[in-house]
Amino acid sequence: ADDVKGLTGLTAAESEELHKHVIDGTRVFFVIAIFAHVLAFAFSPWLH
C-alpha cells in the first residue's frame, strides 16, 4: 500500500524525504536572507 504513486510519480516515503530537503533548503535560504538584510541595514542608508 505504501508503494502507491501519487500525481508526481513519487511514493509517500519519497515525497516525505523530498519535502525534508525542500524545508531544509528553505531554512538555509531564510537564514541567508536575514543575514543579507542585516548587512544591507548596517551598510546602507536604508531606514536610517
UniProtKB/Swiss-Prot annotation:
<feature type="topological domain" description="Periplasmic">
    <location>
        <begin position="44"/>
        <end position="48"/>
    </location>
</feature>
<dbReference type="GO" id="GO:0019684">
    <property type="term" value="P:photosynthesis, light reaction"/>
</dbReference>
<protein>
    <recommendedName>
        <fullName>Light-harvesting protein B-800-850 beta chain</fullName>
    </recommendedName>
</protein>
<dbReference type="GO" id="GO:0030077">
    <property type="term" value="C:plasma membrane light-harvesting complex"/>
</dbReference>
<comment type="similarity">
    <text>Belongs to the antenna complex beta subunit family.</text>
</comment>
<dbReference type="GO" id="GO:0045156">
    <property type="term" value="F:electron transporter, transferring electrons within the cyclic electron transport pathway of photosynthesis activity"/>
</dbReference>
<dbReference type="InterPro" id="IPR023623">
    <property type="entry name" value="Antenna_beta_CS"/>
</dbReference>
<keyword id="KW-0076">Bacteriochlorophyll</keyword>
<feature type="topological domain" description="Cytoplasmic">
    <location>
        <begin position="1"/>
        <end position="20"/>
    </location>
</feature>
<keyword id="KW-0437">Light-harvesting polypeptide</keyword>
<keyword id="KW-1133">Transmembrane helix</keyword>
<dbReference type="InterPro" id="IPR023624">
    <property type="entry name" value="Antenna_beta_dom_sf"/>
</dbReference>
<feature type="binding site" description="axial binding residue">
    <location>
        <position position="37"/>
    </location>
    <ligand>
        <name>a bacteriochlorophyll</name>
    </ligand>
</feature>
<dbReference type="Pfam" id="PF00556">
    <property type="entry name" value="LHC"/>
</dbReference>
<comment type="function">
    <text>Antenna complexes are light-harvesting systems, which transfer the excitation energy to the reaction centers.</text>
</comment>
<comment type="subunit">
    <text>The core complex is formed by different alpha and beta chains, binding bacteriochlorophyll molecules, and arranged most probably in tetrameric structures disposed around the reaction center. The non-pigmented gamma chains may constitute additional components.</text>
</comment>
<keyword id="KW-0812">Transmembrane</keyword>
<keyword id="KW-0479">Metal-binding</keyword>
<dbReference type="InterPro" id="IPR035889">
    <property type="entry name" value="Light-harvesting_complex"/>
</dbReference>
<keyword id="KW-1003">Cell membrane</keyword>
<dbReference type="GO" id="GO:0042314">
    <property type="term" value="F:bacteriochlorophyll binding"/>
</dbReference>
<dbReference type="InterPro" id="IPR002362">
    <property type="entry name" value="LHB-1/5"/>
</dbReference>
<keyword id="KW-0997">Cell inner membrane</keyword>
<keyword id="KW-0472">Membrane</keyword>
<dbReference type="GO" id="GO:0046872">
    <property type="term" value="F:metal ion binding"/>
</dbReference>
<keyword id="KW-0157">Chromophore</keyword>
<feature type="transmembrane region" description="Helical">
    <location>
        <begin position="21"/>
        <end position="43"/>
    </location>
</feature>
<feature type="binding site" description="axial binding residue">
    <location>
        <position position="19"/>
    </location>
    <ligand>
        <name>a bacteriochlorophyll</name>
    </ligand>
</feature>
<keyword id="KW-0042">Antenna complex</keyword>
<dbReference type="InterPro" id="IPR000066">
    <property type="entry name" value="Antenna_a/b"/>
</dbReference>
<keyword id="KW-0148">Chlorophyll</keyword>
<keyword id="KW-0460">Magnesium</keyword>
<dbReference type="GO" id="GO:0005886">
    <property type="term" value="C:plasma membrane"/>
</dbReference>
